[in-house]
């Protein structure tokens, strides 16, 4: 990534003439990294697709609750499924996601991305099955079990974020030199965004099979159970995923210097955390309560099919923003694509908020404006936050910094969900959109000052810069680059014992470490 605040630090603090541990980045060699065998290319493709696909589970979890909130009220009544219970069940997944993102982000740096992805998959499958099996001697007891199981699903979903996105990005880095951003968006945010409308499609199918409102309990249990299949369908392919050269050479196996990393990347981290908070504060409650919003502008608020159909149209239109962001990210850069998306919140949030009383009388027009707001949200922060956060730091700390950014976003989600109903009840429905516009403005300001402008660059270049920064500040630990050098030296000694000139070979090995292998 191109970032003056980091390269300037590197130029000032790194003096390769005085520190023998300084390594050089060989741009020419790395430019040919995509010229591999068909087998290696296929491995990268499988890793990219398999890593990102199960993120559909996050969209499915949110989208399914949007419709099931209506089902629970109709089946068990507002007394058993009050707004307080609804918020608790919804927030359980959010709290779980926060734990999963943070702790799996740390684990992804210390252990392999592959092992963490497999753990995330298993948690998702088990959690979804237990949601479907929620039971209690009383209805409130059943909802308490559902709350706990939704939290478990949330842990699995949260674990997916750092492990899947980082694995897909690092594999895409080895697959292409010019289109990594667009590829990452299409394999991660597309399934994530499509999960919502896909959940609505599944709901409509199950609703029809279960004879409508006659078997509401069967509907919600079936919808939850089907959530098991999305992560399970790619488990085998995830088992076969490959570990990239970027990860092997850029990782630190023990005693990661987090203080130095924070000192090096604080500005970027502030940018990704702040923008993700603003985005999730708006988009998450809008996703969960979209059926509530839609039902408030149609005549028959208990017509589940009508609500679901409008919800599906809204979701499908919003998904169209994903390829727009994928196209722009590799052309105008991540930063300006992010700002473009936030501007949609300002424009359409103000239009809907200021003209809410008029628009709610014209349901199709209301849905179109609402969809445009969500579409630009997907094109900007929805697409770019995962990309920026997964390439804003070196491999050694990429997991934990991505996790911190995503966790901050989910904290924004929790705050947004908690504030959504009180805002509607006390200020009026229009203010949910006006506040979205305010968040869009704040998002643009944070992006402008704290998010670096970048197009494509090799992730390993950033690893080299970070390595050199660490050693120039007295760090004595080992990165993958250093371990590669030690292995080369061992091979040199073995060659010497067989009668080969050691000094000549040793000089060649040092040159390889400093240039070719970096």
Swiss-Prot record:
One of its GO terms (cellular component) is cell periphery. The chain crosses the membrane at residues 45-65, 92-112, 115-136, 139-159, 185-205, 217-237, 269-289, 307-327, 336-356, 361-381, 400-420, 431-451. It catalyses: sn-glycerol 3-phosphocholine(out) = sn-glycerol 3-phosphocholine(in); sn-glycero-3-phospho-1D-myo-inositol(out) = sn-glycero-3-phospho-1D-myo-inositol(in). Keywords: Cell membrane, Glycoprotein, Membrane, Repeat, Transmembrane, Transmembrane helix, Transport. The keyword Repeat applies. Residues 66-91, 137-138, 206-216, 290-306, 357-360, 421-430 are extracellular. GO terms for molecular function: glycerol-3-phosphate transmembrane transporter activity; glycerophosphodiester transmembrane transporter activity. Belongs to the major facilitator superfamily. Sugar transporter (TC 2.A.1.1) family. Glycerophosphodiester transporter that mediates uptake of both glycerophosphoinositol (GroPIns) and glycerophosphocholine (GroPCho) as sources of the nutrients inositol and phosphate. This is Glycerophosphoinositol transporter 1. It comes from Saccharomyces cerevisiae (strain ATCC 204508 / S288c) (Baker's yeast). The gene is GIT1.
């Amino acid at each position: 990534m191109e970032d003056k605040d980091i390269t300037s630090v590197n130029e000032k603090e790194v003096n390769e003439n005085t520190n023998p541990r300084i390594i050089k980045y060989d741009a020419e060699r790395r430019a040919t990294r995509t010229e591999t065998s068909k087998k290696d290319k296929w491995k990268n493709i499988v890793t990219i697709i398999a890593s990102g696909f199960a993120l559909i589970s996050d969209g499915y979890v949110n989208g399914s609750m949007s419709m099931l909130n209506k089902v629970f009220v109709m089946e068990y009544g507002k007394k058993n499924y009050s707004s307080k219970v609804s918020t608790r069940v919804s927030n359980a997944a959010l709290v779980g996601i926060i734990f999963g993102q943070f702790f799996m982000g740390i684990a992804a740096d210390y252990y392999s991305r592959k092992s963490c992805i497999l753990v995330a998959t298993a948690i998702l499958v088990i959690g979804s099955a237990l949601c479907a099996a929620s039971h209690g001697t009383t209805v409130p007891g059943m909802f308490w079990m559902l709350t706990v199981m939704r939290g478990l699903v949330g842990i699995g979903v949260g674990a997916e974020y750092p492990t899947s996105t980082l694995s897909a990005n690092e594999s895409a880095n080895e697959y292409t030199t010019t289109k990594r951003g667009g590829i990452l968006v299409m394999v991660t945010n597309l399934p994530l965004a499509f999960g919502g409308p896909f959940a609505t499609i599944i709901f409509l199918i199950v609703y029809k099979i279960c004879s409508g409102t006659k078997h509401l309990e069967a509907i919600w249990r079936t919808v939850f159970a089907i959530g098991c299949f999305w992560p399970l369908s790619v488990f085998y392919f995830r088992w076969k995923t490959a570990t990239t050269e970027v990860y092997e050479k850029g990782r630190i196996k023990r005693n990661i210097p987090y203080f130095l990393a924070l000192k090096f990347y604080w500005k970027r981290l502030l940018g990704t955390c702040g923008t993700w908070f603003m985005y999730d504060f708006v988009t998450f409650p809008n996703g969960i309560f979209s059926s509530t919003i839609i039902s408030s502008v149609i005549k028959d608020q208990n017509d589940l099919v009508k609500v679901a159909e409008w919800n599906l149209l809204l979701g499908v239109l919003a998904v169209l923003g994903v390829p727009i962001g994928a196209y722009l990210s590799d052309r105008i850069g991540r930063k300006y694509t992010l700002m473009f998306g936030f501007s949609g919140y300002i424009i359409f949030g103000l239009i809907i908020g200021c003209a809410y009383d008029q628009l709610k009388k014209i349901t199709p027009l209301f849905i179109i404006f609402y969809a445009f707001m969500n579409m630009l949200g997907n094109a900007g922060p929805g697409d770019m936050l995962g990309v920026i956060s997964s390439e804003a730091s070196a491999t050694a700390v990429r997991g934990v910094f991505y996790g911190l950014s995503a966790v901050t976003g989910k904290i924004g989600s929790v705050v947004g969900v908690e504030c959504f109903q009180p805002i509607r009840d006390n200020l009026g429905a229009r203010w949910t959109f006006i506040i979205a516009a305010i968040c869009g403005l704040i998002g643009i300001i944070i992006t402008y000052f704290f998010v670096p402008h970048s197009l494509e660059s090799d992730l390993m270049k950033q690893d080299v810069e970070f390595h050199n920064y660490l050693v120039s500040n007295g760090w004595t630990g080992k990165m993958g680059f250093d371990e590669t050098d030690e292995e080369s030296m061992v091979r040199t000694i073995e060659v010497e014992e067989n009668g080969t000139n050691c000094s000549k070979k040793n000089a060649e090995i040092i040159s390889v470490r400093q240039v070719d292998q970096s």
